[in-house]
């Protein structure tokens, strides 16, 4: 059986992180080795703590380590608009733009038949439940849904599906403008472009 050294194992695990290639993983591993014991211990503690304490917000499905996330808890935000995103990291990009002061809903992905991801694998039913709770008076009344999904095939497929599901519910339904380049990931769009894309959103 081929022996894998502790260093090789660390490089392998680091290279599995998104955006981290083998060379970057190797540099990170050597940095960790050079720092002595204190930093690796703090890093290990932070990783274990985030896995133990962070969970989905029961309302919007953003990550939080409290009962509900800061955006759902903030009484100064508008209940009338919900911005739908694919991933929790997309919220940080939108918040940095300063162009949105409503609520959020995280789908945790996008429809991708090739990867076996359909509507049931996403938080789509929960979004529709929020809308219907508003219509019945058991939840905040929602007037607008803004779809801030990635500008790729999966994002477009998800937008078409959501538009069909939300038809006839008296909502203003819009998607962010094409200031976001085709094929781009929301998480890599700069603040100014994201702000313009939200302000110039297109009604569906």
UniProtKB/Swiss-Prot annotation:
Domain of life: Bacteria
Keyword Zinc-finger: yes
Location of the Toprim domain: 80-181
Key words of the record: DNA damage, DNA recombination, DNA repair, Metal-binding, Zinc, Zinc-finger
GO MF term set: DNA binding; zinc ion binding
Positions annotated as zinc finger (C4-type): 57-72
CDD domains: TOPRIM_recR
InterPro entries associated with the record: DNA_Rcmb_RecR (IPR000093), Rcmb_RecR (IPR023627), Rcmb_RecR_Znf (IPR015967), TOPRIM_dom (IPR006171), TOPRIM_RecR (IPR034137)
GO biological process: DNA recombination; DNA repair
Pfam families in UniProt: RecR_C, RecR_HhH, RecR_ZnF, Toprim_4
Database matches in HAMAP family: RecR
Similarity field: Belongs to the RecR family.
Function: May play a role in DNA repair. It seems to be involved in an RecBC-independent recombinational process of DNA repair. It may act with RecF and RecO.
UniProt-listed PANTHER family: RECOMBINATION PROTEIN RECR
Protein name: Recombination protein RecR
Source organism (scientific name): Bdellovibrio bacteriovorus (strain ATCC 15356 / DSM 50701 / NCIMB 9529 / HD100)
Gene name of this polypeptide: recR
